[in-house]
């Protein structure tokens, strides 16, 4: 299970308050419905869910990793959130939402297009009339960025770590290593890049109309790291 040992160090590795605010701002700009209901998939440590809850939205925050959910539940601002462990490729919550979010390139953790298709189908069943799905995913530029090995090293609470990232074909491989109490803890993550047209075709087949931005607010054809896909019923 990924995000097990890593959950303890996740925020120290990737927390970006400015980016969290930009994700929340984008969500508000798209929804334009204060106080509406939102389901977040792959919420991680729930930074974005907590920020949206502070802005008055009703959040259910879900993730496959219960270790990450436990990390999220302990945060200030998490008191008003509902949490649930959930596999985003297939779920049935017996309720619907005004919006579903899947941020931080979480969709790139899915193993293939069939899993993505299954996710979109599950999302469609959980959206209210005129509901919205918003997610981001890697662009081809992101693959190119790690065509040469990237290594980050440092200390988190006196625990040495190393994070290695490298592109292999259409995948980005992450290797995390932590040296704690004389032991090395490791996690290996694989993210897969998907063709944007394939993704849009599957969304259209589910009845969504789509808009694509790059890096929050640029045109679809602009260079950048992330596609932001806005899919509306």
Placement of each model-derived feature along the sequence:
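C-terminal lobe and adjacent flexible extensions of AdoMet/dcAdoMet transferase-like proteins
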Residues: 198-233
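A short SAM/SAH-binding and catalytic strip from SAM-dependent methyltransferases
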Residues: 98-114
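SAM-dependent methyltransferase
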Residues: 134-202
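Conserved class I S-adenosyl-L-methionine
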Residues: 1-44
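A short acidic, Gly/Pro-enriched loop at the edge of an enzyme's catalytic core
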Residues: 89-99
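A short glycine-rich, Lys/Arg-flanked "PGG" loop and its adjoining helix->strand segment in the class I
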Residues: 117-129
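Class I SAM-dependent methyltransferase SAM/SAH-binding core
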Residues: 46-90
